Structure formats: structure tokens, C-alpha cells
A protein has these predicted regions:
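A conserved acidic beta->alpha catalytic loop
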Residues: 1-7, 49
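Short alpha-helix within the catalytic core of nucleotide-sugar-dependent glycosyltransferases
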Residues: 6-10, 42, 55-67
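Glycine-rich, basic loop-to-helix element that forms the pyrophosphate-binding segment
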Residues: 24-40
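Acidic metal-phosphate-binding loop of nucleotide-sugar-dependent transferases
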Residues: 52-53, 79, 126
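Conserved donor NDP-sugar-binding/catalytic core segment of glycosyltransferases
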Residues: 57-88
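Conserved nucleotide-sugar donor-binding catalytic segment
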Residues: 95-177
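Boundary detector for helix-to-coil junctions that initiate low-complexity/charged tails
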Residues: 170-237
């Protein structure tokens, strides 16, 4: 990193001996998470990317649920966005079959370190995204108990970066990698139709996102002015 991350991290290490700074050459998200988990001394793991945020009660509430419901395999919460968007997501886990089609759990969930090690951690061959989705496909199964805290306690930063053809190609490549890696699981639930089903799901999701964006601007003054201008020009013609 060239943004002074090391200096900032070392300052926190000096302030609190519970912090540990571990340096590694950039090897991707999966490798960083695996190395961090290997160094962790606690029972539970919560991955957190540098540009995302947690409410201070998230960990407390997650661990409380594990304590009272030890059969739970994974805990997460509702989540919101900040940066270029400030809305909240209404997505929730609807079972393992739906998870195979689309990831409904964000990256900063809470799970046991022993379970992470049991399945071999995150896939370090993945460098183009969706690492957390592939991880959950291996971590969970049809019988797994997943609990969602009904509060937005995690916030994901939305950056002002437009999607492009290369990004779409990367996602398609990763989807195919995940499908080929877990072809037996997919065949059990969907046969060979999973990739077309996911394409359809993503199209529907994009449509719903567009509807939501339109609704947020429906009664804005500039929208009314725009339509007034358009109608005026049409009448002139």
C-alpha cells in the first residue's frame, strides 16, 4: 500500500497490544483473509475490507447469538451503503438452493475459525471477485442454520466507478469457475440450467434497481422541470 496503511496500523499496535500487524505482498483478498485468520487467536472470524464500516454493536450482537444458539453456523445482519449511495439492502438468506444462484450474504459475516479451517479457507486461486460467495457455497449446506440480525450494522462503500465490458467478462469467468468447481452441487439442485438462471436473476435485479432509482427521484423538482420542458417542446412540434 502507498497510502500510509502500515504507519497507521503500527500506531494502533502501540496503543493496544491486542492489535497485530501482519505484512504480506499483495496476493489477493483470499490470501489476505486466510493469513489473517491463521494469526487470529479468537474463536470467531469477521473479515472486513478497509473501506467498509461496522456499527460498534455488530460483533457484540453476533457473539451473543452464537452463545445462545450454538447450533448456528453463520451470523450476519442487514446492511446499508455509503459513498455514492446511501440506501439499505433488503436482501436476506433464503436457503442453500437460492445461495447457489446468487450470494445473499455480504462479505463481513461472522463464523467460527474452526469451520473456516475445516473447509480450507478462502480460495486463493480467485482474484476477480465473488470470493465470499464461493466460500459460503463450501461453508454452508441445506441443513446449515444462518441467522440475520434485523438491523443495518454493516455499511458497504459504493464507489463512483461505472461498470464496463471487462468487468462483465470477469464476472462471467468467475461464475463459470464456481460452477465448474461445484458442478456436483449445482447438478443436484438445477442440472445444467444454473448459468442461464443466474443471468435471468441478474437481469431482474438490475430492473428492480432501476425502478428503485427512478422512485427516489420521482418527485424531485428537477424531474418535474425536465418533463415540463419535454412536454413544451413536443407541443411546439
Amino acid at each position: 500500500s502507498t497510502d500510509g496503511t502500515e504507519e497507521i496500523a503500527l500506531e494502533y499496535v502501540k496503543k493496544d497490544e491486542r492489535f497485530k500487524y501482519v505484512f504480506q505482498e499483495n496476493g489477493g483478498v483470499s490470501k489476505a483473509r486466510n493469513i489473517g485468520a491463521a494469526q487470529a487467536l479468537g474463536t470467531y472470524i469477521l473479515p472486513l475490507d478497509a473501506d467498509d464500516k461496522l456499527e460498534e454493536t455488530y460483533i457484540e450482537k453476533a457473539l451473543s447469538h452464537f452463545t445462545h444458539h450454538p447450533e448456528t453456523l453463520l451470523v450476519y445482519c442487514q446492511w446499508g451503503f455509503f459513498g455514492e449511495a446511501t440506501n439499505h439492502s433488503q436482501v436476506s438468506y433464503k436457503g442453500y438452493a437460492k445461495l447457489l444462484v446468487n450470494n445473499e450474504i455480504f462479505c463481513s459475516s461472522v463464523f467460527r475459525k474452526s469451520d473456516m479451517l475445516r473447509i480450507g479457507g478462502f480460495d486463493e486461486d480467485m482474484h476477480l471477485g465473488l470470493e465470499d460467495w464461493e466460500f459460503y457455497i463450501r461453508l454452508l449446506d441445506e441443513q446449515s442454520i444462518v441467522y440475520q440480525i434485523q438491523e443495518p450494522l454493516f455499511f458497504y462503500r459504493i464507489k463512483a466507478i461505472s461498470k464496463n465490458v471487462t468487468a462483465a467478462q470477469n464476472i462471467a469467468e468467475v461464475e463459470n469457475y464456481i460452477y465448474q468447481k461445484h458442478i456436483r452441487r449445482y447438478s443436484l439442485y438445477y442440472g445444467s440450467a444454473i448459468l442461464p438462471l443466474r443471468r435471468l436473476f441478474l437481469c431482474e435485479k438490475e430492473l428492480e434497481d432501476c425502478k428503485a432509482r427512478i422512485a427516489r427521484h420521482k418527485n424531485k423538482w428537477y424531474r418535474r422541470l425536465f418533463y415540463k420542458y419535454i412536454k413544451g417542446n413536443l407541443k411546439k412540434k
